[in-house]
Design a protein with these regions (language model features):
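Membrane-interface helix-loop-helix junctions at boundaries between adjacent transmembrane segments
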Residues: 56, 82-169
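Aromatic-rich transmembrane-lumenal/periplasmic boundary elements in polytopic membrane proteins
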Residues: 168-207
Length: 325
């Protein structure tokens, strides 16, 4: 077994602030390159280790096999993304929304009859609802990406801080918001930054996220590929995205007391590392191939984390109301 000294909460919090600063500096200098590196190298290891940890925690749900339903929804997302393209731009967002709704059912309801009724009602409600472009953007684009890596990470941190009530924890939660805000208020000096053809081609499948974020923050109009890769508004948003993803991964790896690397069986650790190396090699061979090959795993960790996200917000609400008593 590997030996790791377990860090206390204050040490982890200060390390996290340091990781935020490092991620911030790199995001200012090489935003596209940082994102592509983090997504290809840190991402797969994060998916594998977090899913393993969630499995040990029964995915924070009340049913033993709830993860099967969430996993099946990921299969549908993959199918309608690559095998049989969705017939409308609400099909995949509806699957994601349904996953979030049934995750809430799995967290709060134990009785199987009530669960079944609520899941059916959620399905019918989504099927009958009238949605537009805003729904597609927030559920189909933002929820599994920037909301997952930034908002849910912040909520998970805040939940832990409210339980431990440490000054260093509060500082880390505030630091995350301040640093994210800095990308929109600090005018970076001219770094003669240009996006190479390889980088722009590798990133093209993510471009929709940038376009909608540029529009959401009202940075410029019209918005096209040139806006994303060659303008200051495009760089501002890309810096924020690169920082959010990179720190999301680093935040997870810093939690040695959660992952407990030293307690992971050698066989499990070897399989995890072998799959991780294989994933990274795919990205090196062709970034597009790696992205498509890991698409299911990426979405799987998003769906399986929904119950934890809901639990985090539940804990935050309980803590806030307990302060008022």
């Amino acid at each position: 077994m590997f030996k790791f000294s377990e860090l206390n909460n204050d040490q982890i919090n200060y390390i996290n602030i340091g990781l935020m600063l490092v991620s911030c500096v790199l995001a200012f200098i090489l935003p596209f390159e940082l994102f592509l590196f983090s997504y290809a190298v840190l991402g797969p290891l994060h998916y594998l280790t977090e899913i393993g940890w969630l499995h040990k925690k029964n995915y924070f749900t009340k049913g033993k096999y709830d993860f099967v339903a969430l996993s099946f929804l990921c299969v549908l997302v993959f199918y309608f993304s690559f095998v049989q393209p969705a017939k409308s731009n609400t099909q995949v967002p509806n699957i994601i929304a349904f996953g979030l709704l049934i995750a809430a059912v799995f967290v709060f309801v134990k009785d199987n009859l009530y669960r079944a009724v609520l899941c059916v009602l959620a399905f019918i409600g989504l099927a009958l609802s009238t949605t537009g472009n805003t729904y597609f953007v927030w559920i189909g684009v933002f929820l599994p990406t920037i909301i997952h890596v930034f908002v849910f990470t912040w909520a998970f941190m805040l939940y832990g801080v409210l339980k431990n009530k440490s000054l260093s924890g509060y500082l880390s939660v505030v630091a995350l918001i301040v640093i994210a805000f800095s990308f929109f208020v600090i005018k970076a000096p001219a770094l003669q930054y240009q996006v190479s053809a390889y980088v722009s081609k590798s990133y093209e499948l993510f471009g929709l996220l940038n376009k909608y974020l540029i529009d959401f923050f009202g940075l410029t109009a019209p918005i096209n590929n040139d806006t994303v890769f060659n303008t200051n508004p495009g760089f501002i948003v890309m810096r924020f995205i690169a920082f959010a993803y990179t720190y999301h991964y680093l935040n997870w790896f810093s939690k040695t007391s959660v992952i407990k690397w030293h307690l992971v069986p050698k066989k499990t650790l070897f399989i995890t590392l072998a799959l991780w190396v294989f994933s990274v090699v795919l990205y090196i061979i062709d970034y597009g191939i790696g992205l498509k090959a890991l698409y299911f795993l990426s979405f799987l960790h998003v769906f399986l984390e929904f119950p934890l996200n809901i639990t985090s917000f539940q804990g935050i609400v309980k803590s806030v109301f307990s302060f008022k008593k």
